From Swiss-Prot:
Record Pfam families: Pneumo_ncap (PF03246)
Gene Ontology MF terms: protein serine/threonine kinase inhibitor activity; RNA binding
Post-translational modification: Tyrosine phosphorylation modulates viral transcription and replication.
Protein role: Encapsidates the viral RNA genome by forming a left-handed helical nucleocapsid that protects the RNA from nucleases. RNA replication depends on the availability of soluble nucleoprotein. The encapsidated genomic RNA is termed the NC and serves as template for transcription and replication. Together with the phosphoprotein, sequesters host NF-kappa-B in inclusion bodies (IBs) thereby inhibiting this host defense pathway. May also act as a modulator of the innate immune response by sequestration of host IFIH1/MDA5 and MAVS into IBs.
GO CC terms in record: helical viral capsid; host cell cytoplasm; ribonucleoprotein complex; viral nucleocapsid
Lineage per the UniProt record: Viruses, Riboviria, Orthornavirae, Negarnaviricota, Haploviricotina
Organism field: Bovine respiratory syncytial virus (strain 391-2)
Location of the region described as Interaction with the phosphoprotein in the Swiss-Prot/TrEMBL record: 244-290, 338-364
Region of interest called Involved in RNA synthesis and encapsidation, as start-end residue ranges on this chain: 1-364
Homology family: Belongs to the paramyxoviruses nucleocapsid family.
Positions of post-translational Phosphotyrosine modification: Y38
Superkingdom, natural source: Viruses
Compartments reported by the entry: Virion; Host cytoplasm
Signal sequence range: none
Protein name: Nucleoprotein
Amino acid sequence: MALSKVKLNDTFNKDQLLSTSKYTIQRSTGDNIDIPNYDVQKHLNKLCGMLLITEDANHKFTGLIGMLYAMSRLGREDTLKILKDAGYQVRANGVDVITHRQDVNGKEMKFEVLTLVSLTSEVQGNIEIESRKSYKKMLKEMGEVAPEYRHDFPDCGMIVLCVAALVITKLAAGDRSGLTAVIRRANNVLRNEMKRYKGLIPKDIANSFYEVFEKYPHYIDVFVHFGIAQSSTRGGSRVEGIFAGLFMNAYGAGQVMLRWGVLAKSVKNIMLGHASVQAEMEQVVEVYEYAQKLGGEAGFYHILNNPKASLLSLTQFPNFSSVVLGNAAGLGIMGEYRGTPRNQDLYDAAKAYAEQLKENGVINYSVLDLTTEELEAIKNQLNPKDNDVEL
């Protein structure tokens, strides 16, 4: 099938219909949800750290604790605003630190725990008990535990959230088919952190975040806004830099772009990952105009603002919308796609066109209807030879 035959089903009609709605939907987050403030951020970071130092840790609650940590960085007021703006009716539980007494092998011990409705004091106590066992083992092996190996090192919470940044890009698939890719990527980018923490098990932590995002969809909205806020904040630790790279690679540099779901103005529907290729697409000129209408998040924002990160995919696949450009590996042209494309016509046409480009060695930029500035950016970045490019 020719690429010219691949069309998006009545995109603009959908947009018009949704834009004229006079009503909004209110959702409930449940009876009570925990919304911690800045003052308990250090304690939540330590909880993440306890899980990270625990050898063979049980990560059942790691996703939840990671999200609580993210909210503590945003602060209670901003988290509430995010949820309310997303249409959620919120009954928020304040979170404080209290002393909890718990029996451990017949002996009463005291633990500092948080007043959470989502995580009992006993569970928090058990996390600390298990972490102490691993810490004692570390003391025997090392003699002295360096700060970056401890459970209270400042980047523990962000290490956990790096895994969440990888998971969030795969949610639109509707299942956990992206888990293997998440694990592979985490093993690569967090390899130094995995040397520090034996409890950093990407598969288990990723599954925990999948569970949280599936069970509590309001956390998706919170995490996306947290990711934007975190990535836009200057400075920070090395792990904060890793997080920003992971999140913005998904959100702002190509993979998380245009899909019909973006019309619903839903943050969840913007998070695409491999599912982007399964969505219905228009051809690039129409998509480009539509993306301009919707604003930077929807389309070719990254061409104008981050050409270095995106022009390679633009070079390889110029006749597709930005979401396909940014997710070329998922499309299968690079031989990475292992799923069944829902839009087989698009997949076949894209593959055929890419193979044609490869055989001819000529890239036709004219189909993109690019501005002079964009063409100049491409030339400056790629330094193409005149006989390699049709302008």
